[in-house]
Protein backbone atom coordinates (compact mmCIF):
# COMPACT_ATOMS: atom_id res chain seq x y z
CA UNK A 1 0.00 0.00 0.00
CA UNK A 2 1.31 3.45 -0.91
CA UNK A 3 1.59 5.82 2.03
CA UNK A 4 -1.13 8.09 0.61
CA UNK A 5 -3.68 5.39 -0.29
CA UNK A 6 -5.85 5.70 2.83
CA UNK A 7 -5.90 9.48 2.89
CA UNK A 8 -6.54 9.64 -0.86
CA UNK A 9 -9.95 8.08 -0.24
CA UNK A 10 -10.82 10.99 2.06
CA UNK A 11 -9.52 13.61 -0.38
CA UNK A 12 -12.91 14.32 -1.94
CA UNK A 13 -14.31 17.45 -3.52
CA UNK A 14 -16.71 17.88 -0.60
CA UNK A 15 -13.77 17.89 1.85
CA UNK A 16 -11.97 20.50 -0.27
CA UNK A 17 -15.03 22.74 -0.37
CA UNK A 18 -15.64 22.33 3.36
CA UNK A 19 -12.10 23.40 4.21
CA UNK A 20 -12.22 26.26 1.72
CA UNK A 21 -15.38 27.56 3.40
CA UNK A 22 -13.53 27.70 6.74
CA UNK A 23 -10.73 29.94 5.46
CA UNK A 24 -12.84 33.07 5.78
CA UNK A 25 -12.87 32.56 9.57
CA UNK A 26 -9.08 32.60 10.02
CA UNK A 27 -9.00 36.21 11.25
CA UNK A 28 -12.47 36.75 12.82
CA UNK A 29 -12.83 33.31 14.45
CA UNK A 30 -9.46 31.52 14.63
CA UNK A 31 -10.79 28.83 16.97
CA UNK A 32 -13.27 27.74 14.33
CA UNK A 33 -10.76 27.85 11.47
CA UNK A 34 -7.84 26.21 13.25
CA UNK A 35 -10.08 23.70 14.97
CA UNK A 36 -11.31 22.44 11.60
CA UNK A 37 -7.79 22.46 10.15
CA UNK A 38 -6.40 20.63 13.18
CA UNK A 39 -9.00 17.87 12.97
CA UNK A 40 -8.30 17.40 9.26
CA UNK A 41 -4.54 17.37 9.87
CA UNK A 42 -4.82 14.77 12.62
CA UNK A 43 -6.78 12.56 10.23
CA UNK A 44 -4.17 13.12 7.50
CA UNK A 45 -1.27 12.13 9.76
CA UNK A 46 -3.17 9.16 11.20
CA UNK A 47 -3.91 7.85 7.71
CA UNK A 48 -0.31 8.31 6.56
CA UNK A 49 1.03 6.49 9.62
CA UNK A 50 -1.41 3.59 9.30
CA UNK A 51 -0.61 3.16 5.60
CA UNK A 52 3.15 3.40 6.18
CA UNK A 53 3.42 1.31 9.34
CA UNK A 54 0.31 -0.86 9.34
CA UNK A 55 -0.64 0.20 12.86
CA UNK A 56 -2.56 2.92 14.67
CA UNK A 57 -0.86 6.20 15.45
CA UNK A 58 -2.14 6.01 19.04
CA UNK A 59 0.69 5.92 21.56
CA UNK A 60 3.19 7.55 19.22
CA UNK A 61 5.00 10.82 19.88
CA UNK A 62 4.51 13.77 17.53
CA UNK A 63 6.49 17.00 17.40
CA UNK A 64 4.59 19.92 15.87
CA UNK A 65 7.00 22.57 14.62
CA UNK A 66 5.20 25.91 14.83
CA UNK A 67 2.43 24.52 17.00
CA UNK A 68 0.98 27.89 17.98
CA UNK A 69 -1.55 28.07 20.81
CA UNK A 70 -2.61 24.43 21.00
CA UNK A 71 -5.45 23.80 18.56
CA UNK A 72 -3.51 20.92 17.03
CA UNK A 73 -2.67 19.52 20.48
CA UNK A 74 -6.33 18.86 21.20
CA UNK A 75 -6.90 17.14 17.85
CA UNK A 76 -3.89 14.84 18.21
CA UNK A 77 -4.65 14.09 21.86
CA UNK A 78 -8.08 12.89 20.73
CA UNK A 79 -6.25 10.44 18.43
CA UNK A 80 -4.15 9.15 21.34
CA UNK A 81 -0.94 10.83 20.20
CA UNK A 82 1.65 12.24 22.60
CA UNK A 83 1.95 15.85 21.45
CA UNK A 84 4.90 18.23 21.77
CA UNK A 85 4.53 21.71 20.29
CA UNK A 86 7.44 23.97 19.36
CA UNK A 87 6.69 27.66 18.90
CA UNK A 88 9.18 30.58 18.87
CA UNK A 89 6.63 33.37 19.32
CA UNK A 90 5.17 33.77 22.84
CA UNK A 91 2.26 35.76 21.44
CA UNK A 92 1.32 32.82 19.22
CA UNK A 93 1.66 30.39 22.12
CA UNK A 94 -0.96 32.31 24.09
CA UNK A 95 -3.14 33.46 21.19
CA UNK A 96 -6.01 31.12 22.06
CA UNK A 97 -6.27 32.58 25.56
CA UNK A 98 -7.87 30.53 28.33
CA UNK A 99 -9.63 28.22 25.86
CA UNK A 100 -6.50 26.08 25.55
CA UNK A 101 -4.73 26.93 28.80
CA UNK A 102 -3.90 23.76 30.66
CA UNK A 103 -4.88 21.68 27.64
CA UNK A 104 -3.23 18.49 26.43
CA UNK A 105 0.35 18.18 25.25
CA UNK A 106 3.55 19.92 26.19
CA UNK A 107 5.06 23.04 24.63
CA UNK A 108 8.56 24.37 24.12
CA UNK A 109 9.52 27.88 23.07
CA UNK A 110 12.18 27.40 20.41
CA UNK A 111 12.97 27.90 16.73
CA UNK A 112 12.12 25.22 14.20
CA UNK A 113 15.48 25.88 12.59
CA UNK A 114 17.29 24.74 15.77
CA UNK A 115 15.06 22.20 17.49
CA UNK A 116 16.03 21.52 21.14
CA UNK A 117 15.58 17.76 20.81
CA UNK A 118 18.01 14.89 20.44
CA UNK A 119 18.46 13.01 17.19
CA UNK A 120 15.88 10.27 16.49
CA UNK A 121 13.64 11.33 19.40
CA UNK A 122 10.09 11.41 17.96
CA UNK A 123 8.00 9.10 15.80
CA UNK A 124 6.40 11.86 13.74
CA UNK A 125 7.51 15.43 13.06
CA UNK A 126 4.90 17.76 11.59
CA UNK A 127 5.20 21.28 10.24
CA UNK A 128 1.92 22.79 9.03
CA UNK A 129 2.09 26.10 7.16
CA UNK A 130 5.35 27.22 8.73
CA UNK A 131 8.02 26.86 6.03
CA UNK A 132 6.85 29.95 4.15
CA UNK A 133 7.29 32.02 7.33
CA UNK A 134 10.98 31.30 7.97
CA UNK A 135 13.98 32.56 5.97
CA UNK A 136 15.59 29.11 5.70
CA UNK A 137 12.79 26.58 5.19
CA UNK A 138 15.04 23.68 4.26
CA UNK A 139 17.08 24.11 7.41
CA UNK A 140 13.77 23.62 9.19
CA UNK A 141 13.18 20.53 7.05
CA UNK A 142 16.62 19.15 7.89
CA UNK A 143 15.94 19.62 11.59
CA UNK A 144 12.65 17.76 11.24
CA UNK A 145 14.45 14.81 9.67
CA UNK A 146 17.16 14.90 12.34
CA UNK A 147 14.75 14.47 15.26
CA UNK A 148 12.55 11.85 13.55
CA UNK A 149 13.35 8.21 14.27
CA UNK A 150 14.30 5.91 11.39
CA UNK A 151 11.09 4.53 9.92
CA UNK A 152 9.09 7.44 11.32
CA UNK A 153 7.42 10.21 9.33
CA UNK A 154 8.29 13.85 8.75
CA UNK A 155 5.33 15.70 7.24
CA UNK A 156 6.11 19.19 5.95
CA UNK A 157 3.22 21.20 4.49
CA UNK A 158 3.54 24.77 3.26
CA UNK A 159 1.77 27.42 1.21
CA UNK A 160 3.23 27.80 -2.28
CA UNK A 161 4.06 31.44 -3.04
CA UNK A 162 2.53 31.69 -6.51
CA UNK A 163 -0.68 29.96 -5.49
CA UNK A 164 -3.80 32.04 -4.79
CA UNK A 165 -3.16 32.05 -1.02
CA UNK A 166 0.57 32.76 -1.23
CA UNK A 167 0.12 36.38 -0.20
CA UNK A 168 -1.92 35.46 2.88
CA UNK A 169 -3.83 38.56 4.07
CA UNK A 170 -2.27 40.63 1.25
CA UNK A 171 -4.61 38.77 -1.10
CA UNK A 172 -3.77 38.44 -4.77
CA UNK A 173 -1.60 41.55 -4.73
CA UNK A 174 1.42 39.29 -4.19
CA UNK A 175 1.31 38.67 -7.95
CA UNK A 176 2.60 42.25 -8.28
CA UNK A 177 5.68 41.23 -6.29
CA UNK A 178 6.13 40.61 -2.59
CA UNK A 179 7.70 43.95 -1.65
CA UNK A 180 5.10 45.91 -3.62
CA UNK A 181 2.26 43.90 -2.08
CA UNK A 182 3.62 44.50 1.43
CA UNK A 183 3.93 48.25 0.83
CA UNK A 184 0.42 48.38 -0.62
CA UNK A 185 -1.02 46.58 2.41
CA UNK A 186 0.74 48.94 4.84
CA UNK A 187 -0.58 52.00 2.99
CA UNK A 188 -4.15 50.71 3.00
CA UNK A 189 -4.25 49.53 6.61
CA UNK A 190 -1.82 51.84 8.34
CA UNK A 191 0.37 49.00 9.59
CA UNK A 192 2.35 46.11 8.11
CA UNK A 193 0.66 42.78 7.51
CA UNK A 194 1.10 40.15 10.22
CA UNK A 195 2.54 37.97 7.47
CA UNK A 196 4.88 40.64 6.17
CA UNK A 197 6.89 39.84 3.05
CA UNK A 198 10.62 39.71 3.72
CA UNK A 199 10.36 39.37 7.50
CA UNK A 200 7.61 36.88 8.37
CA UNK A 201 6.58 35.71 4.90
CA UNK A 202 8.83 34.42 2.13
CA UNK A 203 8.42 33.24 -1.45
CA UNK A 204 8.77 29.45 -1.36
CA UNK A 205 8.08 27.52 -4.56
CA UNK A 206 6.84 23.99 -5.09
CA UNK A 207 9.94 23.26 -7.17
CA UNK A 208 12.23 24.25 -4.28
CA UNK A 209 10.45 21.95 -1.87
CA UNK A 210 10.44 18.99 -4.22
CA UNK A 211 14.09 19.50 -5.10
CA UNK A 212 15.10 19.63 -1.45
CA UNK A 213 12.95 16.63 -0.48
CA UNK A 214 14.20 14.48 -3.35
CA UNK A 215 17.76 15.44 -2.46
CA UNK A 216 17.39 14.01 1.04
CA UNK A 217 16.67 10.54 -0.34
CA UNK A 218 13.78 10.19 2.12
CA UNK A 219 10.79 11.50 0.13
CA UNK A 220 7.96 8.96 -0.08
CA UNK A 221 5.04 11.17 -1.20
CA UNK A 222 4.15 14.68 -2.35
CA UNK A 223 0.63 15.95 -3.00
CA UNK A 224 -1.60 19.06 -2.74
CA UNK A 225 -2.95 19.27 0.79
CA UNK A 226 -6.43 20.62 0.12
CA UNK A 227 -7.18 19.29 -3.37
CA UNK A 228 -9.39 16.31 -4.20
CA UNK A 229 -7.50 13.19 -5.22
CA UNK A 230 -8.46 13.75 -8.86
CA UNK A 231 -6.27 16.89 -8.90
CA UNK A 232 -3.14 15.46 -7.31
CA UNK A 233 -1.53 15.04 -10.73
CA UNK A 234 -0.84 18.79 -10.72
CA UNK A 235 2.11 18.21 -8.40
CA UNK A 236 4.05 16.55 -11.21
CA UNK A 237 3.63 19.37 -13.76
CA UNK A 238 6.29 22.11 -13.57
CA UNK A 239 5.00 25.71 -13.56
CA UNK A 240 1.37 24.59 -13.35
CA UNK A 241 1.99 23.34 -9.81
CA UNK A 242 3.33 26.73 -8.76
CA UNK A 243 -0.03 28.37 -9.46
CA UNK A 244 -2.53 25.58 -8.76
CA UNK A 245 -1.15 23.29 -6.04
CA UNK A 246 -1.64 26.03 -3.41
CA UNK A 247 -0.33 23.99 -0.48
CA UNK A 248 2.24 21.23 -0.92
CA UNK A 249 2.62 18.27 1.43
CA UNK A 250 6.01 16.54 1.53
CA UNK A 251 6.05 13.19 3.33
CA UNK A 252 9.50 11.88 4.26
CA UNK A 253 10.67 8.81 6.14
CA UNK A 254 14.22 8.79 7.52
CA UNK A 255 16.13 5.53 7.19
From Swiss-Prot:
GO terms for molecular function: S-adenosylmethionine-dependent methyltransferase activity. The keyword Methyltransferase applies. Its EC number is 2.1.1.-. Belongs to the methyltransferase superfamily. It is an enzyme of class 2 (transferase). GO terms for biological process: methylation. It holds the Pfam family Methyltransf_11. Keywords: Methyltransferase, Transferase. Coiled coil: none annotated. Disulfide bonds: none annotated. Transmembrane segments: none annotated. This is Uncharacterized methyltransferase MUL_1123. SUPFAM superfamilies: S-adenosyl-L-methionine-dependent methyltransferases.
Amino acid sequence: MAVTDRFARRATLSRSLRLLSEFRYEQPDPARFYGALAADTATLVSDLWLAARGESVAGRTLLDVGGGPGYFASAFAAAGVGYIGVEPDPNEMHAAGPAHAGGPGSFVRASGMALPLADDSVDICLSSNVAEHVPRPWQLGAEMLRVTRPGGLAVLSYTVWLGPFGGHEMGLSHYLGGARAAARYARRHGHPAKNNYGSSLFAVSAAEGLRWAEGTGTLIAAFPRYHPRSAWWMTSVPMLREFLVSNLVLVLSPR
